[in-house]
Curated annotation (Swiss-Prot):
This is GPI-specific phospholipase A2-like PGAP3. Residues 115-132, 181-182, 240-251, 294-316 are cytoplasmic. One of its GO terms (biological process) is GPI anchor metabolic process. The gene is pgap3. Pfam families: Per1. It is a multi-pass membrane protein. GO terms for cellular component: endoplasmic reticulum membrane; Golgi membrane.
Length: 316
């Protein structure tokens, strides 16, 4: 299932009100001095659960987490709104999961995508013209949701970039999928050339964001452009073919639903019970759309097989 919209990519992780607070900064400095040096650091590591060490939680990370909640408690006590820290709302950590609800939602999306990949393989013969393209798209989608799960489990510079880049790869691959379906079957050389262009575009996109400081504004603008192209291309093709292929309503519904559900991102409220925020709700709401989109891919692939079979001359 392709994320036709890219609003979820537009997270500006800059300094926020919470981490600019002198109370927060002084707390982190004091905590690090008292707990993260010498024998006290050794004691911290000895007492730290194995699952926290394995997932890379450091003494400084723990100080920031504890000081975040200390600052939040002061804000609430004085009647102020909950602040964000480093571009994010404060989340209650569960085991080593930094954002438990979003991590679970991403995992469920990945499982749904994987199940639909397996169902597509079992339902569509490999002789279908779109078989390999659909499988490749499915694997790219599963990979993207894998990294989304990792990112929401443990937010680091690496996992953040992998989340963004893999999400971009799904959108670009969806554009290629649409290109193959609209005219690539008739003109494979054009589709191959366009595919090579998309690979080069993706490589340039990743290089620009990797070699220098991560440009969140550019990333948002670029992916929004990719998403709009993807959206309009699919809708235009579905509209043109609506009387020939009745199952196209599934693709249209997925596109429109993703547009509508993405509005959840605009709510941007503090997490309910410090776990469930608008981003997690959006991820949870997209899980059923995988089944509908892969149903469309299956129906369309079987349709192609049927018309190709009907075009084969019959021998008496």
């Amino acid at each position: 299932m392709a994320p036709f919209l890219v609003l979820f990519l537009a997270g500006v992780v800059a300094a926020s009100r919470g981490d600019r607070e002198p109370v927060y900064r002084d707390c982190v400095t004091l905590c690090e001095r008292n707990n993260c040096t010498g024998s006290r650091l050794t004691d911290f590591r000895a007492e730290q659960p194995l699952y926290m060490r394995v997932t890379g939680w450091t003494c400084l990370d723990d100080c920031r987490y504890q000081c975040m909640w200390y600052t939040v408690s002061l804000y609430l006590k004085e009647g102020h709104e909950v602040p964000q820290f480093h571009g994010k709302w404060p989340f209650s950590r569960f085991l080593f999961f930094q954002e438990p609800a979003s991590a679970l939602a991403s995992f469920l999306n990945g499982v749904a995508s994987l199940l639909m990949l397996l169902r597509y393989r079992s339902s569509v013969p490999s002789s279908c013209q779109m078989y390999r393209t659909c499988l490749a798209f499915s694997m790219v989608s599963v990979n993207a949701w894998f990294w989304s799960t990792i990112f929401h489990t443990r937010d680091t510079a690496l996992t953040e970039k992998m989340d963004y880049f893999c999400a971009s790869s799904v959108i670009l691959h969806s554009i290629y999928l649409c290109c193959m379906r609209t005219f690539g079957l008739q003109y494979p050389s054009i589709a191959n050339g366009f595919g090579a262009f998309l690979v080069l575009l993706f490589a340039c996109h990743v290089s620009y964001l990797t070699l220098g400081r991560f440009d969140y504004s550019y990333n948002m603008a670029a992916n929004t452009g990719f998403g709009v192209l993807n959206l309009m291309w699919w809708l235009a093709w579905c509209f043109r073919r609506r009387f020939h292929q009745p199952y196209l309503w599934k693709c249209v519904l997925v596109v429109i639903s993703l547009q509508s559900l993405a509005l959840l991102e605009l709510l941007d409220f503090p997490p309910v019970m410090w776990i469930l925020d608008a981003h997690a709700l959006w991820h949870f709401s997209t899980v059923p759309l995988h089944f509908l989109f892969y149903s469309f891919l299956k129906d369309d692939s079987l349709y192609l097989l049927k018309i190709n079979h009907d075009d084969i001359p019959k021998l008496d």
